[in-house]
């Protein structure tokens, strides 16, 4: 495992425990922080990788790699289709399409904890100049708003987003007034599904009865207005683009804004258990899964492995 300039918080629990771990970083304090290192290299990441390329040997094309390229392309197409879908109730994906559309080349994303975290990972079209921050290992709900304040204070000339679910937003919404008081033009986006969605997902996975997950419907646009910033409610597809255009206009004028998007409480597709493979599941179970998650065009990895003759 080559761990380059990363602070990925789940390295200890998600990587194989016996994997050879090589870490490159220019900060000595983080070497070995997330995982025991076999080789720790204190150096510039870019220069190190360039040197690795010079010293390394070209690898031969492999069927395994080709199968995974096809698999990733299929997954990306699924996400793109969901962001463009307008024939269902309002979901979170079209909002991310708008966020991607208006994002500046060096935008900063402060991502809260919950379904919004995994949705951001899947749907934000980030480039190498667009950092995003969250509370990974501790999963501290409510981190999005203070993170956006810190980002805007640190980088006043860069576009900053706060992306949060309604559960997290309700915990810290009083600090919208801090953005107003200090003239911090942040684009706040609240995904309101009237539930602690990620906890609901976990309870479903563990076969628990629903407990403690329902949230009262909150008018976050009115909350924002009450604290001195413009609040916009979106509950229809055709309201999405004008809302984000208005957000750009306001923040360019030096004013923060909040967009409250009223979405369905439909679960994001659980990639840890994709029920697609006919060799593992019966057809009805597969059909039910595809219908629930609009995954008619998703193909199991096993199909691509067969296509490329991977044994």
Where are these regions (language model features)?
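Glycine-rich, acidic loop regions that bind phosphate or pyrophosphate groups
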Residues: 1-67, 203, 244-247
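Thiamine diphosphate
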Residues: 1, 6-9, 118-196
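Glycine-rich beta-alpha junction loops
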Residues: 113-117, 193-195, 262-267
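Short beta-alpha connecting loops at secondary-structure transitions
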Residues: 31-39, 130-134, 171, 200-212, ...
